[in-house]
């Protein structure tokens, strides 16, 4: 089924599911799209990455993961259907965090002293990059929802 606005509005309410909350732990992930530019509630510019999970590591509970992936009808979602988000503030004092992620965790070459790349140049190379992401659970501001957030990333190899 399509995910267009119209098709979502036409979907029977019995087919609407909450996003899957994967268990806390470390997951192998892949980037399938360019990050989106956005702003925080306070107006700070940021880049939002969406990571798709490809596999759990040994610190993820198999029982908790199976429970999280089980639909109401008993069938299992594919882990590859699950994504998590991670933001980087795009401020002068936080730019190093984005650079560290791109160079250290994704292995994107930043160029040389004589011919350095810009962060924008490096961002053009993110699609298809794999890495590890550690997922934690955080409550929403209103306390009604729990979100799976990435608190740190690491190189895969």
Indicate where each model-derived feature is located.
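Short beta-rich binding modules
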Residues: 1-157
């Amino acid at each position: 089924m399509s995910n267009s606005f119209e098709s979502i509005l036409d979907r029977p309410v019995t087919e609407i599911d909450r996003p899957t909350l994967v268990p806390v732990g470390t997951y192998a992930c892949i980037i399938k799209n360019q990050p989106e530019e956005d702003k925080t509630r306070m107006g700070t510019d940021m880049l939002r990455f969406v990571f798709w999970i490809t596999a759990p590591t040994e610190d993820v509970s198999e029982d908790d993961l199976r429970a999280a992936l089980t639909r109401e009808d008993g069938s299992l979602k594919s882990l590859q259907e699950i994504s998590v988000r991670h933001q980087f503030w795009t401020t002068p004092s936080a730019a190093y965090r984005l650079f560290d992620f791109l160079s250290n965790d994704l292995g994107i070459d930043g160029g040389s002293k004589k011919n350095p790349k810009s962060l924008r140049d490096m961002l053009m190379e993110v699609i298809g990059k794999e890495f590890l992401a550690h997922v934690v659970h955080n409550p929403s501001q209103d306390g009604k929802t729990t979100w799976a957030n990435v608190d740190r990333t690491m190189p895969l190899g």
